[in-house]
């Protein structure tokens, strides 16, 4: 056997993208401030130092967090702990060709808190990065207060040939009932942000359906905040350096399906 990568804590979901890229859904804990999608390639180190004990010359008594940080490969997508769940499950690409709604090619991930997260990925300068959105369920955080409650935490998921989504729960996880739940698209397209991509000045938002010119033309209609986590041996991390980021300009597209935000 040849090791592929190191630095994992407890991934509960693994998956291959349609293009064959390998991702895992890591779980929060020591050296892991939050759950999130990790892109895995040969030789990567994903932050948890326990697996380094098999490396020649490794000395746990002298090895420091600073040394680990220099090798650390950041997650492609961070799921903010709390609003976007607390313990992730399997990751699944929408390969239904539109049978499940306007999210073809995007990623879905279940969570212990009875929700499903939606994520969109892009490759920038050879590295994967992306964004996550509330999608399904309800866990009483600000991001998930209006959806229907799922019966259990989600550990496994799969698409059926008809495009419906099956969500699987496992006994012993302490997150509600066991068994399967089936999600079917009702053919209605709700107004959502479909994707967010990085630009030189800020971000480009793409929507699932056209938005009004009045909505997109007003910078005050968009709120952007930032924060970061500590990388540390302690369990998890608080949100650090939270701050509002001013939206200085909005440039909507003529069809109302996208808008570019310029940030201060």
List each language-model region with its residue ranges.
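Short, surface-exposed alpha-helix to beta-strand junction/turn motifs within ectodomains of secreted
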Residues: 204-248
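A mature extracytoplasmic/lumenal domain signature
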Residues: 28, 171, 209-211, 263
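Short, surface-exposed loop motifs enriched in S/T, G, D/E and P with embedded aromatic residues
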Residues: 121, 135, 244-252
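Structural beta-strand segments of beta-rich domains
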Residues: 201-205, 259
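Short, solvent-exposed loop/linker segments at the N-terminal edge
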Residues: 195-199
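A surface-exposed beta-strand-loop module
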Residues: 251-264
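Beta-propeller domains with acidic blade repeats across secreted/periplasmic ectodomains
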Residues: 1-190
């Amino acid at each position: 056997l040849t090791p592929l990568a190191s630095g994992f804590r407890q991934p509960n979901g693994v998956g291959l993208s349609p293009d064959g890229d390998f991702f895992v859904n890591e779980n929060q804990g020591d050296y892991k401030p939050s759950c999130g999608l990790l892109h895995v390639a040969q030789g990567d180190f994903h932050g948890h130092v326990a697996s380094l004990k098999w490396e020649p010359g490794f000395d746990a008594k002298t090895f420091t967090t600073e040394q680990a940080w220099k090798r650390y490969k950041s997650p492609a997508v961070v799921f903010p702990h709390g609003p976007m769940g607390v313990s992730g499950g399997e990751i699944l690409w929408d390969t239904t060709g539109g049978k499940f709604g306007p999210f073809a090619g995007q990623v879905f991930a279940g969570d212990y808190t009875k929700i499903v997260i939606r994520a969109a990925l892009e490759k920038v300068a050879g590295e994967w990065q992306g964004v996550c959105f509330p999608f399904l369920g309800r866990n009483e955080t600000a991001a998930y207060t209006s959806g229907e409650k799922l019966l259990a935490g989600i550990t496994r998921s799969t698409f059926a040939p008809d495009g419906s989504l099956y969500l699987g729960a496992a006994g012993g996880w302490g997150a509600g009932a066991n068994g399967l739940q089936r999600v079917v698209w009702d053919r209605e397209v709700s107004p959502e942000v479909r994707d967010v991509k990085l630009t030189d000045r800020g971000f480009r938002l793409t929507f699932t359906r056209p938005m009004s010119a009045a909505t997109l033309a007003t910078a005050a209609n968009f709120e952007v905040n930032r924060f970061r986590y500590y990388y540390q041996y302690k369990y998890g991390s608080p949100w650090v350096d939270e701050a509002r980021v001013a939206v200085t300009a909005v440039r909507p597209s003529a069809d109302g399906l996208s808008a570019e935000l310029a940030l201060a």
